Amino acid sequence: LSYVDAIHSRDEDRIYVVERGDDGKRHYNEFPANYVFYYDDPKGKQRSIYGNPVSRFSSRKRTEFEKERRVYSGKQLYESDVNVVFRALSENYLNVPAPKLHTCFFDIEVDFDPDKGFSPTDDPFNPVTAISCYLDWLDQCITMVIAPKHMSPETAAEIVAEFENTILFTSEKEMFDTFFALIEDADVLTGWNSEGYDIPYMVNRVTRVMSKDDTRRFCLLGQLPKPRTYERFGKEEQTYDLIGRIHMDYLQLYKKYNYESRHSYKLDAIGEMEVGENKTQYEGTLDQLYNKDFKKFIEYNRQDTMLLVKIHNKLKFLELANQLAHENTVLLPTVMGSVAMIEMAILNEAHERGMVVPDKKRKIDNDDEAQQAAGAFVATPKKGMHEWVGAVDINSLYPSVIRALNMAGETIIAQVRQTLTDKYMKDKALKLGAAKKRAKEGDEVTGAILWEGLFGALEYSAIMNQERGTILTVDYEDGRSVEMSAAEIWKMVFDSHKPWMLSANGTIFSYEKEGVVPGLLTRWYSERKETQKKAKEAYGTDMYEYYDKRQLVRKILLNSAYGALLNEHCRFYDKRIGQSVTLSGRQIVKHMMSQINQTVAGDYTHEGEAIVYGDTDSCYFTAFPSLKEQIKNGELDWNKELCIGLYDSIADEANNSFPAFMEKAFHAPRKNGEIIKAGRELIGDRSIFITKKRYAINIFDKEGKRKDKEGALGDIKAMGLDLKRADTPKYVQEFLMDVLEMVLQRGNSREEVIEKVKEFKRVLVAQESWTKGSPKS
């Protein structure tokens, strides 16, 4: 048995759990609430992550717990603020496999009032006219409809009879009763934008047509749907969270777990992109369809539901979310954020090591904290056409940096006070502010732009240059502050046999014992490698999906960890760590680019002739200009196979350089330096770079797989070029792609491309104006 959902009854001090068993049946369970905290105690038998002894207080009564917690007010407490439901899940379900959920995919249609128009979700004056539910445990789509008022019962019955599992109703109440009967054995309700429309409309409509008490039938455990406000298009909207039976909006799941952004998130656009299917097309309005073509209206409602089912069957995002929730003992809706899930993952890891974690810090308003942390390094590309561009990228850059420098709150030794950096930032903010249009005196610019051009705190640069005349302050974690020259700090870290490392943020970490977070990331990384290997071995068998899902879970956890740690609402938030990650990451990427340029052109610089572009964890380069003379003279027989071999060896050389660089730049031991790994990702024969985040490459080899076989000319990777914008008419999208193929794949001349553009312009001018702006035309 494993949990589906759980609630905490504060009055009864109980945790009520809905479970789904291996037998496919629903079960109910309950546990006494366990209220726990730890406090510093020299005689304590347990340890915090910082290594200090602590003692435990626990109670089954909330009032007793809160009374005791007040006694320790103002003192450092541990885990007193852990969610009591998550604690129960951790104590009772850790390492229990996720259950196979019963999911109902659904979609509703609503009537239109000719006088009052469409009804909003908070005032649902129009009746629901159709509900389609696909129940995955029965593999059936069931549709409930109410006929238009003008239609005779006989005609309506004839139309409905043409569809399987479709039921005609004369009253909304009967239809809602049937809907509740159908979802009785569902664990999850999901729809497309159901958070914004279907759920709030249905809950409010049931309240109006039946009663508020009837809305309990959406939930289990006798609970009412819980109202929640959220922001949408800059406006506050209200929706409802279901209890016992969970609601998950598939649109939100898609946005979270599909890593490529889409110009349109409408079901029609996503259906076409993911499964090659569209919504049912019709002329006029949905109200006209309902009243004039009832058959197509039913078809439309059923197709909306089945399109969602097909998208899910391909992507399996619900199963992914379920797996994430259970691996980290949180509730299913919790995975829609990353902070609470990552916190529980770290807490569970600490407990496995016999340690406890501190309470969240109370937020203190501080100008220094308000200064935005440095972001990723993104270079300005060399604009124009480039031939034979290769890309090398670093595997999981940020998680790897955290592991390599053993970054954790409990491993921080000291921080070099950022007096120079703060002054530089202040001066730059004022200078950029003064340059703004209509600038007022004292205007400042804030944000990541202030870090442009920097690869570390100024203090870090002074230390690495061993400047004797630059006096800096080292703030130790034990409260001491010591003034030293930058050269003395370098000697203290790099030349005194201490197990210390210095990040590019000027934070000193110890590698004496592994931190909880780096250890957890190391485990996830090795588990991912292992499950990737098993997935590869199981390809073509029933077990492939099982292993592939598990490696994807690890990938998501690794990527989520850094974002959560940099979120000020996270228990483990520390700006020093967040900035150490990005600035050290910048140093590593800068080195990789410099190393690649040295291998190709003989000069150690990240802005050398071989470098085309750099972004976050990737370097785009070309060796072709350096070899042009040799190719021209016939000394080198240039072809794709030779290019692949050469670029692979360039990537290997960059990869092999990391351990020595990590020791020189951060004083990282060799085994830590070996954590940073890069690999050749792609090679393209032709590419065009426009500006940051906007480029296109015709790829002929991606990670060792050829893309130009069996008549294919390659695979175009287009970033930020608006080729698939939802508001771009189809014929314009096709034209833009055709031009890109002419330039990158077919080798057309400049004159031919210009003529193609002129021809398109002539056709466009001659077209009727109403067709020009239609995305469907």
Question: What is each residue range found by the language model?
Answer:
Residues 159-166, 183-188, 290-296, 327, ...:
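Glycine- and acidic
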Residues 179-202:
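Proline-aspartate-enriched helix->loop->beta-strand connector
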Residues 198-208, 395-409:
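Short active-site loop/helix that positions an aromatic residue
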Residues 620-777:
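C-terminal polymerase-core module
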Residues 287-406, 414-416, 421-434, 543-595, ...:
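Common nucleic-acid-contacting/processivity interface regions adjacent to the catalytic cores
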Residues 279, 589-616, 628:
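Active-site palm subdomain of RNA-directed nucleic acid polymerases
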Residues 141-145, 150-166, 170, 189, ...:
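Active-site-proximal helix-loop-helix substrate-binding element of RNase H-like nuclease domains
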Residues 1-185, 219, 302-303, 307-329, ...:
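DnaQ-like (DEDDh/DEDDy) 3′-5′ exonuclease domain used for proofreading
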